[in-house]
Amino acid sequence: RYRTEEGSIESRCAHAARTFDLTRREEEVLALLLKGCTRSEIARELFVSGDTVKTHIRNLYRKTGVTGKDELVQAIGGKGLV
């Protein structure tokens, strides 16, 4: 799990959304990923299916140019966001 302050995650996700042209839902999924939530936890939190979460995560990876969660956190960190 990645540890950082709640407000910090929200503001950094908002900045990432602008930087990478994320949808509002992708931004929400990103915030939950950064809080350490699993795919199934994200699905329950957002009232969507696991497949929908998987699609949002795939879109996050594509838009940010990464291939995994750790790399996603690094990519955002590289932009001065995390």
Region spans (language model):
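Pre-recognition alpha-helix immediately N-terminal to the DNA-recognition helix
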Residues: 27-31, 71
